[in-house]
Amino acid sequence: IGVRLVGSEMCIRDRAYTHKILTGRLKEFKTLRQENGISGFCRPDESVHDAFISGHSSTSVSAALGIATAMKLSGDKTHHAIAVVGDGASTGGELYEGLNNAGKSDTNIIVILNYNEMSISKNVGGMAKYLSSMRTKESYQRTKGRVERMLDKTPVIGKPLKNAVRNSKNAVKNMILHSTMFEDLGFHYIGPIDGHNLEELEQGLMAAKAVNKPVFVHVNTIKGKGYAPAEANPGEFHGVGSFEIKTGNPDVVLSDSFSSIMGKELCEMGEKNKRLCAVTAAMKYGTGLQYFAKRFPERFFDVGIAEEHAVTFCAGLASMN
């Protein structure tokens, strides 16, 4: 969940593979998730470039806020702590706990949402596109900041005028962009941005750096973009092991993997015990539970990436003897 940049820290989750390749572990990448090989997540004991150890999901905002606060306490006002989260993390409660705390903090934290599906809220027409593009311009953010500071120093009418302009602007912007959720939490919202357009992405990130408050950057992407097997079966390529590049077929036959054997055995147990249920935190394929889900759909529960909820939910199930 952490990437150590030059003077900054980036807390990430499922972008760790790309990060490992870019930070000198290309040769070791063939040992990914193997005994004595490199980890599938960021680990500080593996590389000086890994800022923080990771788990499944939803933890990066909390970690980034801690890092941003530590930088602030040390007197560092220049650099940023960046949390990169996927839309799957939105089912995890810790994400919202972190956002709730971070949005009201006086820290240099940037949260980047990598959204693989459709837009969080449908934006309306050309005006929405224009406003979104304006908000991703660094020059706009810096000019806006200078004007606000000038109005703050203007006697008598300065602050009331600034508040009136801001309220009018927010009313129009929220009506068109529907960005109130994140801004109500205290973030400056930028986006949505096309994550496959590098120029637009760079422009948005530069604009985020120019904002002197917590920033939420909404980036839309297509999972597996450019690789047909992954685009066709994104679920099967989540946390994937080694595979044949041309076809996308795994090197290890799925039926022979530990997860598949466990999943099939669980089905046999489910036949004998009608009270047996299976619960997963958005990892049906990774845990081999797709077989159980198909055979016993009424006893299979995918609660999303919400491990705390999953454990207590299981306890509630088990309590009804």
Name each model-derived stretch.
Residues 116-262:
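Long, well-ordered, tryptophan-enriched scaffold segments
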Residues 28-38, 104-121, 139-142, 301:
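A glycine-rich helix N-cap at a beta->alpha junction
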Residues 1-7, 12:
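Single conserved hydrophobic/aromatic residue that forms the stacking wall/gate
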Residues 17-24, 90-99, 121-132, 202-204, ...:
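Short acidic, glycine/serine/threonine-rich loops at helix termini
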Residues 16-40, 136-154:
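N-terminal structural subdomain of ketosynthase/condensing enzymes
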